[in-house]
Amino acid sequence: MTSEFSLSCCDIERYLGEDESRVHALRGVSLDITPGTVHAVVGPSGCGKSTLLYILGLLDPPDAGQVSIESEPVSHLSDDAMAHKRSRFIGFIFQFHFLMEDFTAQENVMIPMRKLGKLSDYEMRGRSADLLEAVGLGDKLRRPSRHLSGGEQQRVAIARSLANDPRVILADEPTGNLDTANSERAFELLQNIVQQGGKALLLATHNPAIAEACDWIHEMKDGRIIASHPRGTQISIFK
């Protein structure tokens, strides 16, 4: 049975810092993401994009409001259950790849599988090899990540985000460190993964071309989503 929403949040509030330095980072944010769709969150630096992704990814709790995965609220879960839910249902891609530089491409992709603990070593090696083949790195699976180009490292990061076959992929500036050609390749790869696998993708980006190719664009300002636009809408922030 497929849930209506892969990921959703309602009335999220988040404060960062203490005392005089306390900042109201998210203000009543609500968002629904359905399977097979690609969403972009755009807005100026400091508007709350990354904070929102961390909360939706169950890496940081909200101060108020609710996050649900496949229509199931998660606030009641224990820390262990929350970690399992995160490992099983959510894949992450960041601007800086956070690869283990002395690990091979294959070993990096296997890290989330080892954490979840559901596959044998043989199965993990087979799945990681298949994922690297899917992102065009089948011939480099045994190469240490420090010997890969920036574009190749980001493709390893994409493969790693898919290690546990997540329902949702969250990407924080996934192409921000890449040149135009590699940015386009990485985003096209993510689009294909979403379309073919029925997954959902939410990414924070400053790249107009990438944002405008998404199914939905959500504009953020001062911790709020101020507007949501379907693909094809002219967005004022990019004019």
PLM feature spans:
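Short coil-to-helix "N-cap" segments within the ABC nucleotide-binding domain's helical subdomain
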Residues: 80-81, 104, 116-133, 142, ...
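Short coil-to-helix segment of the ABC ATPase nucleotide-binding domain corresponding to the Q-loop/switch region
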Residues: 103-112
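Conserved ABC transporter NBD signature motif
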Residues: 65-73
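Conserved catalytic motifs of ABC-family nucleotide-binding domains
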Residues: 165
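Conserved ABC ATPase signature
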Residues: 144-154
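Catalytic Walker B motif of ABC-type/P-loop ATPase nucleotide-binding domains
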Residues: 169-172
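ABC ATPase NBD coupling module
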Residues: 20-23, 74-91, 121-122
